[in-house]
């Protein structure tokens, strides 16, 4: 049965792609050539096309005064690279079957933060009863004994209970509230249901936005996102991808079951390649669409280039950031095979608790205070700017608070005086500032640093990697090695030189290839060339959020005792003022975001641990006393070298 192209796309289940369509009728006559978004396309009656994907071409946004109703909505296009951070508002329109949910939502086991729904009534299964209103997480869709089933789970008493639901399962399923914060890119990729709009709340920014802000000045509120889709298709005898708007006035007929799809290009994305079985590699492919911003030193990923995809793999990288006082830092992924040599740089510690975490049995931690702190207890030490300490270990002590003895956690140190040393006990809750004094002159390779020291760790490249033509790390004055992460890669090479391979990151390189044939050459040993990869602010943010999501967050520092009764120092007051800030890394609009989320508990845990002190660090660097102390320390370090 013939349908308009728009009707067909509306009813299309994306899990069934690709689909082969025959053009039935429309305003496009045989032999006519039309310009469609930069691609010439002949859509004559009887023409056959293969739809490979449905992508969001652009996002239209409408500002709402309230989530429930809009007042004088003004629609505007939101740039796809807009660095806003958003909280998703749960959709109030129910889904009536599980099939409707799976057609509209992205459900993949590889995706974090799986979609969650609740049912208006109890669902009785063979071995389990899903209670009314209970949060159901949809993990994946797969065929079981010839029937398509949805793998689900519910969390009870900190334990997951798994079960399956058929696509035919009926009822009123409502979307659950989602407390996570998302970038616009994440929402576009997998948080906008097909054929629906998405209401979100702008909470902050992940990076500085140099272009004109499309939102009103100071706006933080509800926005309706309306996607405009484009169809990605291939045609016989063409090697490029055709992009068509679903609103194109033609009628089509689905002939997938009666047509040999092998007549078309087998076009695969980077993600499609990674999802192939291991036994299908190595394969030969031709690059159809090359990635933008390709960092490979050779033109290996150019359109028309024939490459060998040897296998898929995972590799460890060190996530590093440039040490700078402002927010516009550069970020890198450094392979563990990097041959450059590093020398240590002083670390900064915003609290005494950070000193306790950073101390090492390998060597005593020597620091200089950059902030003054007055202790309200005789049993605990006060600190002046310029005081030097050797950090030893944590210990408890009794203090007298309003006539009542209380046990407090402290950090045992040695205070270095001019001709002697004295014992000092710093309160762990102390919100101060310290800079490390480096005595170690040794040069380290990155593998040695990761093995001998706890990350994060500050370094500088002293000897560049001579095996790299252009070592981009050599010109960076200071780097913070933040954490070791594991990324997914495709190992590829030029067909003309299959022994020299390169790693292509699956999540950060978007390319399209056409499969040619299986590779019949020698699949023995080959040389893998790894690069230092510079990543964008958004990519850095996503890595920090998801690559370590399976780890528990670090323990929280001790709280100041009896805050209401004890006279607060300016430092502790500053700490209180920042305790409920929204956890959006490098957020530009702090005050407004704080008001928006001041009553939401648990938001801290949704943010990369390394980003939580950014605001405090920036505030700290503004204070003149600390800046002076830091300058003196670095001068001392340079003099020693």
From Swiss-Prot:
GO biological process: adaptive immune response; negative T cell selection; positive T cell selection; T cell receptor signaling pathway
Listed GO CC annotations: cell-cell junction; COP9 signalosome; cytoplasm; nucleus
CABIT 1: annotated span: 1-259
InterPro entries: CABIT_dom, THEMIS
Entry annotated with the keyword Cytoplasm: yes
Main location as per UniProt: cytoplasm
Residue span of region CABIT 2: 260-518
UniProt keywords, alphabetically: Adaptive immunity, Cytoplasm, Developmental protein, Immunity, Nucleus, Phosphoprotein
Phosphoserine modifications at: 584
Localization of this protein: Cytoplasm; Nucleus
Modification comment: Phosphorylated on Tyr residues quickly after TCR stimulation.
Family: Belongs to the themis family.
Main function: Plays a central role in late thymocyte development by controlling both positive and negative T-cell selection. Required to sustain and/or integrate signals required for proper lineage commitment and maturation of T-cells. Regulates T-cell development through T-cell antigen receptor (TCR) signaling and in particular through the regulation of calcium influx and phosphorylation of Erk.
Assembly and interaction partners: Interacts with PLCG1, ITK, GRB2, and LAT.
Name by which UniProt lists this protein: Protein THEMIS
Organism encoding this protein: Bos taurus
């Amino acid at each position: 049965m013939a349908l308009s192209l728009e009707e067909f796309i509306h009813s299309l289940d994306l899990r069934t792609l690709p689909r082969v369509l025959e053009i039935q009728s429309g305003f496009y006559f045989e032999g006519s050539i039309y310009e469609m978004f930069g691609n010439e396309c002949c859509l004559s009656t009887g023409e056959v096309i293969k739809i490979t994907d449905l992508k969001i071409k652009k996002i239209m946004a409408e500002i709402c005064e309230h989530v429930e109703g809009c007042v004088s909505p003004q629609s505007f296009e939101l740039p796809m690279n807009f660095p806003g951070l958003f909280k998703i508002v749960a959709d109030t329109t129910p889904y009536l079957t599980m099939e409707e949910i799976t057609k509209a939502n992205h459900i993949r086991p590889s995706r974090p933060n799986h979609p969650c729904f609740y049912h208006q009534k109890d669902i009785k299964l063979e071995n389990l009863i899903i209670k009314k209103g209970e949060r159901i997480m949809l993990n994946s869709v797969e065929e079981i004994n010839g029937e398509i089933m949805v793998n689900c789970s519910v969390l009870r008493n900190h334990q997951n209970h798994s079960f399956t639901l058929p696509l035919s399962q009926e009822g009123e399923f409502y979307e659950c509230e989602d407390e996570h914060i998302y970038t616009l890119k994440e929402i576009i990729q997998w948080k906008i249901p097909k054929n629906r709009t998405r209401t979100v709340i702008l909470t902050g920014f992940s990076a500085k936005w140099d272009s004109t802000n499309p939102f009103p000045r100071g706006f933080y509120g509800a926005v309706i996102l309306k996607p405009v889709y484009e169809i990605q298709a291939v045609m016989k005898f063409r090697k490029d991808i055709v992009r068509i708007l679903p609103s194109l006035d033609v009628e089509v007929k689905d002939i997938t079951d009666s047509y040999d799809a092998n007549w078309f290009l087998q076009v695969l994305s980077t993600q499609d390649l990674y999802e192939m079985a291991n036994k299908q590699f190595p394969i030969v492919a031709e690059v159809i669409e090359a990635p933008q911003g390709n960092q490979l030193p050779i033109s290996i990923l150019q359109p028309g280039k024939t490459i060998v995809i040897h296998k898929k793999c995972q590799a460890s990288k060190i996530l590093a950031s440039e040490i700078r006082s402002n927010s516009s830092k550069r970020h890198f992924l450094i392979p563990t095979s990097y041959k450059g040599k590093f020398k240590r740089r002083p670390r900064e510690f915003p609290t005494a608790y950070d000193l306790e975490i950073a101390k090492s049995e390998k060597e005593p931690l020597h620091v200089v205070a950059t902030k003054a702190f007055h202790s309200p207890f005789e049993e605990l030490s006060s600190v002046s700017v310029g005081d030097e300490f050797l950090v030893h270990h944590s210990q408890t002590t009794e203090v007298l608070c309003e006539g009542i003895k209380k046990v407090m956690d402290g950090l045992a140190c040695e205070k270095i005086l001019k001709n002697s040393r004295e014992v000092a006990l710093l309160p762990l809750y102390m919100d101060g500032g310290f800079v490390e004094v480096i005595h170690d002159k040794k040069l380290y390779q990155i593998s040695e640093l990761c093995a001998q020291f706890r990350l994060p760790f500050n370094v500088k490249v002293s000897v560049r990697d001579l095996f790299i033509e252009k070592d981009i790390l050599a010109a960076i004055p200071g780097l913070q090695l933040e954490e070791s992460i594991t990324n997914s890669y495709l190992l590829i090479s030029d067909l003309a030189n299959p022994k020299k391979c390169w790693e292509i990151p699956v999540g950060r390189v978007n390319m399209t290839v056409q499969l040619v044939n299986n590779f019949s050459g020698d699949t023995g040993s080959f040389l893998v060339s790894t690069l230092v990869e510079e990543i964008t602010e958004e990519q850095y943010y996503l890595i920090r959020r998801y690559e370590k999501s399976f780890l528990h967050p670090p323990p929280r520092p001790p709280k100041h005792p009896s805050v209401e009764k004890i006279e607060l120092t300016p430092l502790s007051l500053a700490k209180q003022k920042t305790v409920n800030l929204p956890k959006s890394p490098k957020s530009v609009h702090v005050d407004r975001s704080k008001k928006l989320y001041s009553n939401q508990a648990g938001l801290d845990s949704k943010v990369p641990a390394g980003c939580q002190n950014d605001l405090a660090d920036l505030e700290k660097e503004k204070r003149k006393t600390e800046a002076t102390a830091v300058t003196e320390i670095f001068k001392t370090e340079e003099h020693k070298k």
